[in-house]
């Protein structure tokens, strides 16, 4: 059994660990199967939820659609928070244990099964401010998972293909998420994402 949810069109299948079929040991293969958009249900990732302990209302384990593990997804964590609230395991304040540590979310609004959360991802750690990958300038960050950020003037190029190459670039032994950022004005950015283990996840902000 699963619930399907999305945050900014980044979609996930969510399953309670206690409801996994007995004997299901190869979670990587299961993730690839159910996340396949042609032969499975289809999703960018699979989240396994467990009841929390201590400060945490719940805990999540994230599997990408290619069967790899990831520390955290901000969108996925918000989806998990919605399920915890719906299950009565949390109310306005939600604490979730992730592979990148304990994350705090606050429920801002709810309309039926549509939830709006504010989430503290923590400070971004700049690992390299002026890097060059694939002959392009970029910034390398860590926000609980690795990020490579390119500033672009437009999106009229094969940015998903570039994202796929950068994801597996030798500079990133554990692979990386890739973001392409266009500055519209001092207050507005347009962003496209190539997600590690999932590819172009359709999120546009």
Where are the language model's segments positioned?
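A glycine-rich beta-to-alpha transition motif near the start of alpha/beta enzyme domains, typified by
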Residues: 1-113, 149-205
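Alpha-helix C-terminal capping segments
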Residues: 49, 130-133
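Short, solvent-exposed secondary-structure boundary/capping segments
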Residues: 113-121
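Short, charged/polar, Gly/Pro-enriched secondary-structure boundary elements
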Residues: 125-129
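Internal active-site segments that recognize and position negatively charged phosphoryl groups
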Residues: 132-159
